[in-house]
Regions:
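A structural signal for conserved, well-ordered secondary-structure elements
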Residues: 1-304
């Protein structure tokens, strides 16, 4: 009976974040939220009901009477181990405060590497026949696109595919703007295309001969603003919803406030780490809708 309440609370808080994620997410994010909720419900059903049935069945047949859940290694692994967390509360609080200040400082000064989901712009995933350096590709495109923001990151591990993000002419409307930008991209990347391919081949999503665009995405400024607003609200509502559930469940405002502060701290540390290390680590730390989904999932599990 004591175990059930802990299992129920931990699963319900994760479902709360899944529901919020479904309501504020789009496309694949909603799919992830649906999968998360279904997975939690099935896991809860099997852990609480089916597992109990199996154990009762075998025990009623006088089997598994001496079953244990330890091994020779784990049985004595934590014997006589005592961590005096509360005795060193000032140390942990000081370390946490320093970490929070550092993260806030980096977020305020360096910010985050935002994807076009939050800035608006175009993504082009381009595959080459030979390995290329992202910085080399960025310089070629920057010369052609002038003052527009251009970022290039490697995709995969073969070194032949990159994702190009730019806000070049994103404010312009018209039927020919997209095709003109693809033509500019073709001209800029000619030095690294291995064959004398035509523009038609380069923009053909099904033809990878000599290097070509294999996918593209456009997010307009108004859509990017809506996504940004939804992302902020989803995180705030997740914190408040879990805090409200804790208040209703345990009837103690201190528990509710403590849970919100702890979850907000965890979220701040995640954002701070991304702010500190983007551009330093050899892989992308770009913030997009998938990242927001990961943060909400972390919030749901962190409360446990």
């Amino acid at each position: 009976s004591n175990a059930f309440s802990a299992i129920f609370d931990s699963n319900l808080t994760s479902i709360i974040t899944g529901i919020i994620l479904f309501n504020f997410g789009t496309g694949p994010i909603r799919g992830f939220a649906t999968t998360l909720i279904i997975g939690i419900l099935i896991s809860f059903f099997t852990a609480v009901f089916l597992t109990r049935l199996v154990y009762e069945y075998f025990m009623n047949k006088d089997k598994w009477q001496n079953i244990t859940f330890t091994t020779g290694l784990s049985k004595n692994l934590m014997q006589n181990v005592h961590f005096d967390f509360m005795g060193r509360a000032k140390t942990w609080l000081t370390a946490g405060a320093i970490a929070a200040v550092v993260c806030i400082g980096f977020l305020a000064t360096r910010g985050l590497s935002k994807s076009i989901d939050f800035t608006g712009g175009r993504n082009f995933k381009v595959q080459f026949e030979n390995e290329v350096e992202p910085e080399q590709i960025r310089e070629l495109i920057a010369d052609k696109f002038g003052d527009a923001n251009v970022s290039v990151i490697a995709v995969g591990t073969d070194g032949k595919t990159v994702r190009i993000s730019t806000n070049y002419r994103i404010q312009e409307e018209g039927n020919n703007v997209d095709s003109e930008i693809e033509a500019y991209l073709y001209e800029a990347l000619k030095p690294v295309l291995t064959q004398d391919i035509s523009l038609e081949t380069f923009i053909d999503r099904d033809n990878y001969t000599g290097g070509s665009i294999i996918s593209s995405q456009k997010v307009g400024p108004s859509i990017a603003e809506d996504i940004t607003t939804s992302a902020i609200w989803s995180v705030v509502l997740a914190l408040l919803a879990i805090g409200l559930y804790i208040l209703i469940r345990f009837r103690n405002i201190a528990y509710s406030i403590g849970s919100i502060v702890a979850l907000a701290f965890d979220t701040l540390i995640i954002l701070g780490m991304y702010s500190i290390f983007w551009g330093i680590l050899p892989f992308s730390l770009e913030i997009d809708q998938t990242f927001i989904g990961a943060v909400l999932t972390a919030i749901g599990y962190s409360i446990n």
